[in-house]
Swiss-Prot record:
<keyword id="KW-0813">Transport</keyword>
<protein>
    <recommendedName>
        <fullName>ABC transporter permease protein NatB</fullName>
        <ecNumber>7.2.2.4</ecNumber>
    </recommendedName>
</protein>
<dbReference type="GO" id="GO:0140679">
    <property type="term" value="F:ABC-type sodium transporter activity"/>
</dbReference>
<feature type="transmembrane region" description="Helical">
    <location>
        <begin position="300"/>
        <end position="320"/>
    </location>
</feature>
<dbReference type="InterPro" id="IPR013525">
    <property type="entry name" value="ABC2_TM"/>
</dbReference>
<keyword id="KW-0739">Sodium transport</keyword>
<comment type="function">
    <text>Part of an ABC transporter that catalyzes ATP-dependent electrogenic sodium extrusion.</text>
</comment>
<feature type="transmembrane region" description="Helical">
    <location>
        <begin position="353"/>
        <end position="373"/>
    </location>
</feature>
<dbReference type="GO" id="GO:0005886">
    <property type="term" value="C:plasma membrane"/>
</dbReference>
<feature type="transmembrane region" description="Helical">
    <location>
        <begin position="172"/>
        <end position="192"/>
    </location>
</feature>
<keyword id="KW-0472">Membrane</keyword>
<keyword id="KW-1003">Cell membrane</keyword>
<comment type="subunit">
    <text>The complex is composed of NatA and NatB.</text>
</comment>
<feature type="transmembrane region" description="Helical">
    <location>
        <begin position="19"/>
        <end position="39"/>
    </location>
</feature>
<feature type="transmembrane region" description="Helical">
    <location>
        <begin position="273"/>
        <end position="293"/>
    </location>
</feature>
<keyword id="KW-1278">Translocase</keyword>
<dbReference type="Pfam" id="PF12698">
    <property type="entry name" value="ABC2_membrane_3"/>
</dbReference>
Amino acid sequence: MLSHIYKKEMIDALRDRKTILLTILVPMIMMLGLVFFYESMLSDKGEQYTLAVGHSLPPALESKLNEIDEISVKTFAKPEEAVDEGKADAYLNVPKEFDSYVNSMTPFKVDVYGNSIDQGSSNAMQLVQSALDQYKNEIVQQRLTNKHIDQSVIQPFTIQQKEADEEKGTSAIMLSAILPMLILTSIVSGAMPIALDIMAGEKDRKSIEALLLTPVSRNKVLVGKWLAVSTFGVASGVFALVFLILSTVLFTENLKTAFQLGDHMWSVIGASALIIVLSALLISAMELFISIMSSSVKEAQSYMSLVVFLPVFPMFFIFSKAPNQFDLSYFLIPFLNLHALFKQLLFGMVDPATILSTSGTIAVLIAIFFLLARACFLKDKWVLPK
């Protein structure tokens, strides 16, 4: 009888176009948008910045700035106002006596004006600052050469910064932030329509009484409904993961480096599949419990909005942390553990202890919410329409 109930609920759900829309199309559109957004953040290609000046620059300095492909030097009558009005990204203020000051070794000041709050202006200021530093070093080196002084006198050592994981770097950080959020949000949105309809909807239609009058036990009815909701949650999560991987690998250049998992690939896939299934079972139990407690679909929808935000909040707590900084406590906090685990997996860190801790925490929550849903489902005051 359990299989018959499960099959009935699945058939009823698949007849609803809204279910298919929220299970497939909405996650697909959302993922495509976020993938291209984060890819554009990682890629600086095609970005052009306007550098305002008040007069012509010294030839050597102008040549140094022209070597930067992203910078276009433009003369304005009022360059500072041009930056304030958005006509230019930054303003370089150098004295007209630049060359004479350099030749006479007279110290002087160069101003780089911009708005660090604006990303374009901030990038332009950094590029100009870097070019000025290089040009300043060249002048110093030339002066030392003229005085027959070895450059090592003022440069005893050089500094070279290296990333711990240069191959993945920023792309893995970006994906580790959006991957768990997208998967969990897809599970929530995929399971929600059927969870709303399967209990609160039947109360609105007053069809729940007929189901309860059948000889099937309420426990089997509840399990059948829960498995049906979970199936849509799992399908949404798997589809979200597969589509995210495909869209990232096929349509991006920077983000796809995060999926270079090497020997850990199958371990990561297996752990991800386990977490998706457990997350779907948990979210489905939560949504089913809310649907049973609610007297109508409208009331259930207001409560469900709280569930939608659960996958998002943890991202802000771990975004700035490296995956090797998580202690065991991170994997015992619901939903935060999912974000932490996916971040470790994307960096190729497959730790059985963290996987078991996360799975165990989710399993305990599944049992709690299912038992709460069962306790309410066995009482007529929660099941029968008011």
